[in-house]
């Protein structure tokens, strides 16, 4: 007689998360729970949270890569809101997607109107007519 509550030959394999099955880092289970609690629809399919999670992970990776490049260009090792702002506003598609989003402490893009710049002087040289 075995004297424990567990099974004698525990051949159960460890459970694999849906995130691991899909090869994702973001939590599929949490997104599924939020979709159910959010009353977006009466029923949520099993593939919907996986797809949404993969889209969110891709967008986050894209923004963080561009922000990391902006931080490196400014010789910084830490991404700050300014770097996020520069990354989003300099990318045409991300700027369109997040056009009406305000990033706190993001600042503005450096831009000087063309009419405010000093006029370019014509070169004096051999090419001028006499």
Curated annotation (Swiss-Prot):
Q: Where in the cell is it found?
A: Nucleus; Chromosome
Q: Which GO terms describe its biological process?
A: DNA repair
* UniProt PTM: Phosphorylated to form H2AS128ph (gamma-H2A) in response to DNA double-strand breaks (DSBs) generated by exogenous genotoxic agents and by stalled replication forks. Phosphorylation is dependent on the DNA damage checkpoint kinases MEC1/ATR and TEL1/ATM, spreads on either side of a detected DSB site and may mark the surrounding chromatin for recruitment of proteins required for DNA damage signaling and repair. Gamma-H2A is removed from the DNA prior to the strand invasion-primer extension step of the repair process and subsequently dephosphorylated.
Give residues where Phosphoserine occurs: 127
A Gene Ontology cellular-component term: nucleus
Q: Which residue ranges traverse the bilayer? A: none
Q: Which SUPFAM superfamilies match?
A: Histone-fold (SSF47113)
Task: Cite a single Pfam family from the UniProt record.
Answer: Histone_H2A_C
Disulfide connectivity? none
Say if the entry is tagged with keyword Lipid biosynthesis: no
Q: InterPro entries, alphabetically?
A: Histone-fold (IPR009072), Histone_H2A (IPR002119), Histone_H2A/H2B/H3 (IPR007125), Histone_H2A_C (IPR032454), Histone_H2A_CS (IPR032458)
**What segment(s) does the record annotate as region Disordered?**
1-22
Q: What is its main location?
A: nucleus
Give the N5-methylglutamine positions (modified residues).
Answer: 105
Q: Which residues form the signal peptide?
A: none
Keywords for the protein's UniProt record, in alphabetical order: Acetylation, Chromosome, DNA damage, DNA repair, DNA-binding, Methylation, Nucleosome core, Nucleus, Phosphoprotein
Query: Motif [ST]-Q motif: which residue numbers?
Result: 127-128
Q: What does this protein do?
A: Core component of nucleosome which plays a central role in DNA double strand break (DSB) repair. Nucleosomes wrap and compact DNA into chromatin, limiting DNA accessibility to the cellular machineries which require DNA as a template. Histones thereby play a central role in transcription regulation, DNA repair, DNA replication and chromosomal stability. DNA accessibility is regulated via a complex set of post-translational modifications of histones, also called histone code, and nucleosome remodeling.
Q: Which PANTHER family match?
A: HISTONE H2A
On subunit structure and binding partners, the annotation says:
The nucleosome is a histone octamer containing two molecules each of H2A, H2B, H3 and H4 assembled in one H3-H4 heterotetramer and two H2A-H2B heterodimers. The octamer wraps approximately 147 bp of DNA.
Q: What name does this protein carry?
A: Histone H2A.1
Which source organism does the UniProt entry give? Lodderomyces elongisporus (strain ATCC 11503 / CBS 2605 / JCM 1781 / NBRC 1676 / NRRL YB-4239) (Yeast)
């Amino acid at each position: 007689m075995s004297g424990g509550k567990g099974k004698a030959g525990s051949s159960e394999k460890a459970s694999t998360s849906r995130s691991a099955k899909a090869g994702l880092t973001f939590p599929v289970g949490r997104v599924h729970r939020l979709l159910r609690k959010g009353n977006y629809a009466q029923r949520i399919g099993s593939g919907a949270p996986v797809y949404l999670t993969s889209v969110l992970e891709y967008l986050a990776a894209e923004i963080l890569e561009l922000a990391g490049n902006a931080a490196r260009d400014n010789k910084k090792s830490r991404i700050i809101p300014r770097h996020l702002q520069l990354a989003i506003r300099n990318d045409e598609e991300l700027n369109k997607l997040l056009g009406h989003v305000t990033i706190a402490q993001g600042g503005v893009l450096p831009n000087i109107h063309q009419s405010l710049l000093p006029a370019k002087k014509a070169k004096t040289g051999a090419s001028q007519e006499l």
